[in-house]
A protein has these predicted regions:
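Activation segment signature within eukaryotic-like protein kinase domains
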Residues: 16-17
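Protein kinase catalytic-loop region centered on the HRD/HxD motif
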Residues: 22-32
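Conserved activation segment of eukaryotic-like protein kinases, specifically the C-terminal portion
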Residues: 67-79
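Conserved catalytic-loop aspartate of Hanks-type protein kinases
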Residues: 91
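Conserved C-terminal C-lobe helix
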Residues: 140-153
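Conserved HRD-motif arginine in the catalytic loop of eukaryotic-like protein kinases
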Residues: 160
């Protein structure tokens, strides 16, 4: 989905969210954590379905937690960046950030949707996200969709959806 620029229709954001949630439901049933959900790893099929790709750093989680850094830090959950133990909630967070990006003119949290940030501003936005500043709502999307995205992107894993099935 990386080829998009500008405002993305809400229906498309919802379709991406539902299709990737379906992929994560399957991952969760197999105890797999993807760990690298980002726009570049979401492809569209010839039938218009969105697929999650690049399982190169995915890991199985059998009653254990991970504490290794893997994935793209732009979409990485705070607990991964800060090297805390984590579980499947990191995929919920990353999907939430992808949906946020789609609803915010392809800009990440703390970056104005109508502005091209400098590298320093991007770094400051990343720091604010990782240190727990509450995310502002994305610029576009219904209040209901914004609330779903913000819950998925909650700083504390316990405040996120507990599973992809719940988010779906």
């Amino acid at each position: 989905i990386k080829q998009y620029a500008g405002s993305i229709p809400e229906e498309k954001v919802i379709k991406v969210g539902m299709d990737i949630c379906s992929a994560l439901v399957l991952c969760e049933s197999k105890h797999i954590v993807h760990r690298d959900i980002k726009p570049e790893n979401i492809m569209v099929s010839e039938f218009g379905d969105y697929k999650l790709g690049d399982f190169g750093i995915a890991r199985t989680m059998y009653h254990t937690t991970q504490a290794t850094i893997a994935g793209s830090d732009r979409y990485m959950a705070p607990e991964v960046i800060t090297r805390k133990e984590y579980g499947k909630e990191v995929d919920i967070y990353s999907l939430g950030l992808v949906l946020y990006w789609m609803l915010n003119n392809c800009k990440r949290p703390f970056i104005d949707a109508d502005y091209i940030p400098s590298n320093e501003e991007n770094e400051q936005a990343q720091l604010r996200r990782v240190t727990g500043d509450p995310l502002p709502p994305p610029k576009y999307g219904s209040r209901k969709l914004q609330n779903i995205v913000l819950k998925a992107c909650a700083y504390e894993p316990k405040d996120r959806f507990s599973s992809a099935r719940e988010m779906y």
